[in-house]
């Protein structure tokens, strides 16, 4: 993975672009996730997606921390040790909440990614109701943001695949008799 020099962004802060060895954006796939955020579209500027790929995410956090320590003079204006850099870094997954916040629109306010249903047909993002559906998301790491006393990763939502949520409306367990007949005694 390579990182660029810090550049001023439109918000007045600084951003570092992140590229992999082939000079392509790093793409990260999330496992199936559910959100309680409501409707995707104009009413919501971002969604929260849960991930079960915590090992891969923690590895990416370590790579980012390594780069931050190595480039601390350029990124922060002075050389810093790993402990100091780690205190400033906002990890991808918060310990309290295993979620990643991903904006769904770009600067123009429109979503340019693809939204697909279970049949792989393109659908309108305004028709997605997160309270009744599950989805897979493909997100892309697009840079590192810096604000006073903190830095973290910036993400872009590339695609969403919507799945109907399966609700259990009837008894879902096997018969108790079947379960106990195969069990071994303690």
Model regions and ranges:
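A sequence-composition feature that detects small, non-aromatic residues
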Residues: 21, 43, 68, 137, ...
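Low-complexity, compositionally biased segments
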Residues: 64, 84, 108, 177-185
């Amino acid at each position: 993975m390579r990182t660029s020099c810090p550049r001023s962004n439109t918000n007045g802060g600084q951003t570092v672009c992140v590229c992999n060895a082939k000079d392509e954006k790093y793409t990260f796939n999330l496992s199936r996730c559910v959100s309680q955020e409501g409707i995707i579209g104009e009413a919501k500027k971002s969604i929260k997606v849960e991930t079960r790929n915590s090992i891969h995410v923690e590895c990416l956090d370590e790579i980012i921390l390594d780069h931050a320590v190595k480039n601390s003079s350029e990124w922060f204006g002075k050389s810093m040790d790993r402990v100091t850099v780690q205190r400033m870094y906002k990890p991808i997954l918060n310990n309290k909440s295993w979620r990643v916040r991903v904006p769904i629109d770009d600067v123009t306010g429109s979503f340019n990614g693809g939204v697909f249903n279970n049949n792989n047909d393109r659908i309108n993002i305004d028709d997605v109701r997160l309270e009744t559906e599950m989805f897979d998301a493909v997100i892309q790491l697009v840079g590192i943001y810096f604000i006073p006393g903190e830095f973290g990763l910036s993400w872009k939502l590339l695609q969403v695949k919507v799945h109907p949520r399966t609700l259990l409306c009837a008894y879902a367990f096997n018969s108790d008799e079947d379960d106990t007949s195969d069990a071994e005694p303690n």
